[in-house]
């Protein structure tokens, strides 16, 4: 698991989402709009895929609302998803052929520039970052 550095964000957005199966599509649409407005279209597909995986995991493993933060730093775009699911720190798995679940964090690990998990007494935060190559704010 790679570790983050914490540069000061240029801007931040936050989204509180209910425990609702439609939340994943709401978060994807929100991130798509934010990245388009910031002229970061070069990372939309990757970020949309990764946020779908992380928010889906939060929905499946928690029964309460989830909070999503989106930050643009000088070097990357970071997404953090907080949920209220207690338990073991999630790790990438190697699912068996034909398994429909268990690939999400492996996809996050493969497609992000950095990612990680922070445990809290009330749940956890899964974060990832993607660097837009050749784009300056």
Map each language-model feature to its residues.
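Conserved beta-strand-loop-beta-strand hairpin that lines the nucleotide-binding pocket
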Residues: 1-14, 59-137
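STAS-typified acidic loop motif
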Residues: 14-28
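Short coil/turn residues that cap or connect secondary-structure elements
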Residues: 19, 35, 39-42, 58, ...
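Conserved short strand/loop->alpha-helix "switch" segment adjacent to the catalytic nucleotide/phosphoryl-transfer site
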Residues: 24-52
């Amino acid at each position: 698991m790679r570790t983050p550095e914490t540069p000061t964000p240029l801007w931040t957005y936050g989204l509180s989402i209910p425990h609702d199966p439609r939340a994943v599509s709401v978060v994807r649409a929100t991130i798509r709009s934010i990245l388009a407005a910031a002229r970061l279209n070069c990372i939309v597909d990757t970020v949309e895929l990764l946020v779908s995986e992380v928010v889906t995991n939060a929905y499946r493993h928690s029964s309460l609302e989830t909070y999503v933060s989106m930050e643009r730093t000088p070097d990357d775009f970071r997404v953090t998803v907080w949920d209220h699911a207690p338990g073991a720190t999630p790790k990438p798995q190697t699912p068996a052929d034909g398994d429909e679940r268990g690939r999400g964090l492996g996809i996050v690990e493969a497609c992000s520039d950095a990612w990680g998990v922070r445990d809290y007494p009330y749940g956890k935060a899964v974060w990832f970052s993607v660097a837009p190559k050749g784009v300056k704010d």
